[in-house]
Amino acid sequence: IQWATVGAVVAGILFVYIEVTQRNPYYQFDVLKLRTIRFGFLFYFLLMVLNSSSMFVNVFTGIGMKLDNYQNATLGNWSMLGYFIGGIATIWLSVKGVHFKYLFAAGFLFLGLSAMFMYFEVQGAGLYERMKYPVIIRSTGMMFLYSLIPTFATQRMPYKYLSSWICTMLTVRMVLAPSIGTALYSNVLQERQQHYITRYAQNVDMMHPEASASFMQTVQGMQYQGKSKQEAVNMAATSTKGRIQVQATLSAVKEMAGWTLYACLFCMIFVVVLPYPKRKLLT
């Protein structure tokens, strides 16, 4: 990964150098002078980073509910309904003349509502049937932003910048932002998971009534099945560790869902207070 990162940075610097020194470059850096284009890149970056929170559903169903990949993939199919709802709502609100900033804010609002749903839903007795709701809500918000960002960014954009816009947009939307978002959420999840494992394991010993009773019950059960005492103790310890890991993972997901909600609220306020260029509608 380190060498791949170094290679990507070197290749990027080399590309910029070649394009700057050429008389007729393929990439027009003047595209970055357009304010709507810069806003479009920024909004796509925020969207794709926050969209990495989709991992909450997979982590919760995989760890908390012990579901397989097929059942997780089945949940993903509900995103089509969210895209449909978001598409219809986007068209209807656009026809009504709602300003772009409120539509962008609505998109981040739905992403935040999905995170809020996961915050309150993550628990040891969660229901599989309810996991389709955060998928639908998040997909609805994604459709708002996915469809409107390029429409907003390319307003009155000169045709000569089209290829440069597409190149940069795909780089931000498909490479930079998803990789940064995935790395951020994965590393933070692992770090918070280890934090909660250490925190919960401190109180789990033979002096703890519930932990001690569960441990001894598992040891006796293993011995009844013909296991030796040492094997039974090892399996009981593994079982206790597994329960702690599950609880730690659920706590980490709940905490990250809360921070994602705050991030979405910040993005909502941010896209509303930005100074947008005035549109001149042709009649």
Predicted features and spans:
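Phenylalanine-glycine-rich, low-complexity intrinsically disordered regions
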Residues: I1-Q2
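Small-residue-rich alpha-helical segments with characteristic i,i+4
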Residues: M131-A211
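Hydrophobic transmembrane architecture of multi-pass small-molecule transporters
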Residues: M174-Y276, L282
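Transmembrane-helix signature of multi-pass solute transporters
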Residues: V10-A11, F110-F120, F266-V273
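Transmembrane core module of solute transporters
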Residues: N24-L148
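Short helix-capping/hinge motifs at transmembrane helix termini and TM-loop junctions
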Residues: Q22-R23, E121-G126, P158, Q193, ...
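Structural signal for alpha-helical transmembrane segments and their membrane-water exit/capping regions
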Residues: A11-Q22
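Hydrophobic alpha-helical interface/terminus motif in multipass membrane transporters
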Residues: E19, T61-G62, A153
